[in-house]
Design a protein with these regions (language model features):
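PLP-dependent amino-acid enzyme catalytic core
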Residues: 1-428
């Protein structure tokens, strides 16, 4: 597989290089040189296969012979060890639930596949993953790499600034997972990570990798669950399918569009955002004008400069698609709350991100169309806000309940690079 840097097309790398490097020069994103396409008969055959077999074929179409098919299938089986069911919400609407993995969020798919790829590519060479988190990413990375050989994971998070449930999810693992509560905010944690990657001696000594969410391996993994969704739909729904994607950094939408590029039958996509509406405004008037980021109920989408957007534009350019065909909607917190109650009234418990995707879908769905919206996180991950909005108590899923009483294993450090460096070098 060949990929090129969107900021410098002369920089071309293999799949293995893109996975280990993460980003290209000038923080450029990598994009596939070749965009494979399946014939209609191939799509029909793919949709009859099981999740792992189908996903292996999809990933193999991109990765090529860089990873032998048998090995790839083995790694896919290890990564995608949980379902992605479509739950019927209304006669013409379903939710693709992506929260049945170990950390109850869609990031489990990309995180676990990236972990499998990185450990294969690194072989026996020790790797240290260093990343900062405000919650979800840390949990997905921790569980994805937990127990893998020759990998040490160090996760920084702002002390006292993530929910107790989130903290329990990834700070109770131990083993090869080290968590560090930093006396500062998320920006302070990110600054420490940046300093570590600027330290050539530390980088070389520990084999540092960031496991960043824009890693190409995570993006390719996400394509697979769009096919899994369509495979569960009756033929009449497949013919008139509209997909609504809750969008923050736009990785999920990019993956869906790549699935369409492969030949998956999707009539149109909708980019659903909260009040951080840079993309909806751009699609409306053609002006890219990010505002200051606003805090909302759907905090995972509080992004005003989505870093995957250049990949969306590149795909539309390469496929000669029109951006004007991409649906969009920006949903306020008040409408999000009302929509969560509306969904509850038809028997479906949702959280803010999925509710936004549903609202954008419901408001634009035409007669005869079938709508699918993405459920990216388990409602219990937003227990406090969901309970307050719906006026009822949510039971804790076992993934959260079984960790609730475990002791936290985190180190505590000031927001000081020398202290972090010492910890990493003495334990490395």
């Amino acid at each position: 597989m060949k990929l090129y840097n969107l900021k410098d097309h002369n920089e071309q790398v293999s799949f293995a290089q893109a996975v280990t490097q993460g980003l290209g020069k000038n923080q450029g994103l990598f994009f596939p040189h070749d965009l494979p396409e399946f014939q209609l008969t191939d799509i029909d055959e793919l949709l009859k296969q099981d999740f792992v077999t189908r996903s292996t074929k999809i990933l193999s179409a991109f990765i090529g012979d860089e990873i032998p098919k048998e090995l790839l299938e083995e790694r896919v089986r290890a990564a995608f060890a949980f379902p992605a069911p479509v739950k019927q919400v209304e006669p013409d609407v379903g939710c693709l639930e992506l929260f049945h993995g170990p950390t109850l969020a869609f990031k489990d798919f990309g995180g676990r596949f990236m972990a499998q790829m990185l450990t294969h590519i690194s072989g026996d060479k020790p790797v240290t993953i260093l990343t900062a988190t405000s919650g979800d990413t840390g949990a997905a990375v921790a569980h994805a790499f937990y127990g893998l050989k020759n990998v040490r994971v160090v996760i920084l998070y702002p002390k006292g600034k993530i929910s107790p449930l989130q903290e329990k999810l990834f700070c109770t693992l131990g083993g090869n997972i080290e968590t560090v509560a930093i006396d500062g905010d998320f920006d302070a944690c990110q600054a420490l990570v940046k300093q570590a990657f600027d330290d050539e001696e530390l980088k070389a000594a520990l084999g540092l990798n960031s496991a960043n969410s824009i890693n190409i391996s995570r993006l390719l993994a996400q394509i697979c669950y769009y096919f899994e969704a369509v495979a569960q739909l009756p033929q009449e729904a497949r013919n008139q399918l509209v997909v609504s994607v809750p969008s923050g950094n736009f990785g999920d939408l990019t993956a869906g569009l790549l699935a369409k590029s492969l030949g998956l039958p999707v009539k149109r996509f909708i980019a659903a955002t909260n009040a951080n509406d840079t993309v909806p405004r751009f699609l409306k008037d053609g002006k890219w004008a990010p505002n200051a980021t606003q805090a909302t109920l759907s905090n995972a989408m509080d992004v005003s400069q989505p870093n995957n957007w250049p990949r969306v534009e590149e795909l539309f350019r390469r496929k000669i698609w029109r951006l004007s065909d991409l649906g969009y909607a920006a949903v306020t917190d008040e409408t999000t709350k009302a929509t969560m109650r509306e969904l509850k009234a038809v028997g479906y418990t949702s959280e803010p991100h999925a509710a936004i995707a549903y609202r954008a879908l419901r408001d634009s769905l035409q007669p005869g169309e079938y709508g699918l919206f993405l459920g990216t996180a388990h409602p219990a991950k937003f227990k406090e806000s969901v309970e307050a909005i719906l006026g009822e108590t949510l039971p804790l899923p076992k993934e959260l309940a079984e960790r609730a009483d475990l002791p936290l294993l985190s180190h505590e450090l000031p927001a000081d690079f020398a202290a972090l460096r010492k910890l990493m070098m003495t334990r490395g």
